[in-house]
Amino acid sequence: MMKIYYKIAIIVLPAIIVSMICMNPFLSRYAAAEEKNFNFVAVGDLDCNINSMQTVNNILDKKPQIFLALGDMYYDCNPDEFMKVFSLLHGILYMTMGNHDSWSKFAGLYHLPNDKPYYSFDKGNVHFLSISTESDLRPNSTQYDFINTDLDIASQNRSISWIIVLAHRPFISSETEHITEKEDFKTYPPLFARYGVDVVIQAHVHNYQRTFPILLDNFSNPIIVTKNNTINEGTGVLYITTGGGGHDLYEFKSKSPYVQTQYAEYGIINVNSTENALTIEAYTNKDFESPKDTFTILKGYNTTKPTPMLKYVYINTSKGNGTIPTPKGLIEIPFENGTVRIPVKYNYSLPH
């Protein structure tokens, strides 16, 4: 009988590394799950203090299948104190890199699927794209090409109902500390609108903010599509800042005209995703039971709400001159002199 010998290697790692490897969601059962009804929680800027523990309890109260950690979770925490906070979130953690997360420390603590600080993944019928606002975001950068290609593919995938972008630094926010950001950020809101992103979830600013559904073809002139708290998918992009994880809160200097709700309190957002609706609820640490802010996005046209809605469609014409017939032949759009991109705004109450 042939004998087979095995060599066993024992590697001693710091407790924090071992614990974070055990928490890696890309190796857990959650990453492969395909159910369309699930909930996830998001917050950034956690830190290690009594406010952080209240935030973790708030998260656990929602029983999420995914926890989206939006950067700056560690700060200068003692590793043991950090693990007291994070060990309770075993197996559901997806990280987005923040400005206090050096890549060397970040890459050592959190395994990412492509060994880059940006990545994407699907959960059920939701596509998540995590952007690194600490890496090169200039047009034609490696990350820009990844984002552009990823959103293009996701927008054409019929099995994807919702597209959600995750970032640490905010693309759009009311005036407060940290609000002066990179010039390259202006490239992205038009890109998000073009590919039908539903929600952009961001942090860095230590408070809560939610915009109206907006569209930006020109960054300096955001268009508020509607002021309703229930909208149809494709009506506009929602920008949510949830940076009240536990670090010092930031008070507001003003309220931007495209921000609908804002407050400086610790808390999280909980998102319930189904095949036909995305419901976003903001919970403060003072009240785990009653959401302080709620917003719902409906999939497709909701016949029970006949209020006309607006949607933007980008049409790329071929070279040359001619006309573009719209569905049902309602109108024709003339074009000339090569390829142009035309924003078309139409009424949902009409056939299309």
Role assignments for model-derived ranges:
Residues M1-A33, I342, L350-H352:
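Secretory targeting signatures
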Residues F26-E81, S173-S174:
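N-terminal active-site segment of His-dependent metallophosphoesterases
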Residues E34, L249-T323:
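A short C-terminal boundary segment appended to hydrolase-like catalytic domains
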Residues F40, F67, F128, I163-I164:
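Hydrophobic beta-strand anchors of alpha/beta hydrolase catalytic cores
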Residues D45, G71-D72, G98-N99, H168, ...:
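Active-site glycine-centered loops adjacent to acidic/histidine catalytic or metal-binding residues
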Residues G322-I324, G329-P334, T339-P343:
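Short linear proline/tyrosine/threonine-rich motifs used for host-factor recruitment
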